[in-house]
């Protein structure tokens, strides 16, 4: 899984080096990034299906590909942070998660090839950055000390009004709110203690699958905003933080 992420990321890193030259043409840059996204997913599909021929594959670009082994599914986002990539902002990631029937997500990888931050997790064994650094959520207990990450609904996405209400409720109580543009990295950064919490609505399973397990294995809590844990991997509307901050943030979001 890690090697597949690295190989797909190598192609993205090469393509990222060319993006700046295309900024003169919005359409040119957009088409280039779309092709980079598709190429990265094709690389992941080929490598993962070769390694585990029977497993299913759910990718952002190709959708669901059924496997003969109905108990295992790869969940893949080849390029989370597409808009950042298109604007030559070095904050994006390749994401792979493995879902097992009856157990949920059992392993995952989130990799930013530009910073070489490789976050990985295995159920029951912990979450890590690189080879050795164990991830733990931040220990802050008070909202006025906390920095939160979120995602802002953009063109064509629903929920602008609700987001502004939530931002109003949350921002009055916290030390800061950040919007970096890649949900998978936001979750990894919460797991690593860089951010204290992350919330966002209208996500997809490939945005969050690896991050869900990272939060859990780093001692954090992740639920949907309505606290229905059973469908948190489906993305939708999630809140991730440490155990102490979670109810405090949830209270602010529900007041919106």
UniProtKB/Swiss-Prot annotation:
Entry binding sites for Mg(2+) 2: 77, 80, 207
Binding of substrate, residues: 60, 79-82, 178, 207
Catalytic function, reaction form: a myo-inositol phosphate + H2O = myo-inositol + phosphate
Cofactors that this protein relies on: Mg(2+)
InterPro entries tied to this protein: IMPase, Inositol_monoP_metal-BS, Inositol_monophosphatase-like, Inositol_monophosphatase_CS, Inositol_monophosphatase_SuhB
Binding site for Mg(2+) 1: 60, 77, 79
GO molecular function annotation: inositol monophosphate 1-phosphatase activity; metal ion binding
EC number(s) reported in the record: 3.1.3.25
A family per Pfam: Inositol_P
Keywords: Hydrolase, Magnesium, Metal-binding
Translocase keyword on record: no
GO biological process: inositol metabolic process; phosphatidylinositol phosphate biosynthetic process; signal transduction
Family the UniProt entry places it in: Belongs to the inositol monophosphatase superfamily.
Protein name: Inositol-1-monophosphatase
């Amino acid at each position: 899984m890690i090697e597949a992420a690295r190989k797909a990321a190598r192609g993205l890193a090469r393509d990222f080096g060319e993006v700046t030259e295309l900024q003169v043409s919005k359409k040119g840059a957009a088409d280039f990034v779309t092709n980079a996204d598709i190429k990265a997913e094709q690389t992941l599909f080929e490598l993962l299906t070769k390694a585990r021929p029977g497993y299913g594959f759910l990718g952002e670009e190709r959708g669901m590909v059924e496997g003969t082994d109905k108990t295992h599914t790869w969940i893949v986002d080849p390029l989370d942070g597409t808009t950042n990539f298109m604007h030559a902002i070095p904050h994006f990631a390749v994401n792979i998660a493995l879902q097992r029937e009856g157990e949920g997500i059992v392993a995952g990888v989130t990799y930013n090839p530009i910073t070489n931050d490789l976050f990985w997790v295995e159920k029951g064994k912990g979450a890590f950055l690189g080879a050795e650094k164990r991830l733990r959520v931040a220990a802050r207990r008070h909202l006025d000390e906390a920095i939160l990450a979120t995602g802002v609904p953009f063109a064509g996405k629903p929920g602008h009004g609700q987001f502004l209400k939530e931002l109003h409720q949350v921002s009055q109580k916290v030390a800061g709110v950040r919007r970096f543009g890649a949900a998978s990295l936001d979750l990894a950064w919460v797991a690593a203690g860089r951010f204290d919490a992350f919330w966002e609505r209208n996500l997809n399973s490939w945005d969050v699958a690896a991050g869900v397990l990272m939060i859990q294995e780093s001692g954090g809590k992740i639920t949907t905003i309505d606290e229905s844990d059973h469908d948190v991997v489906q993305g939708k509307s999630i809140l991730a933080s440490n155990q102490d901050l979670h109810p405090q943030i949830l209270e602010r979001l529900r007041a919106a």
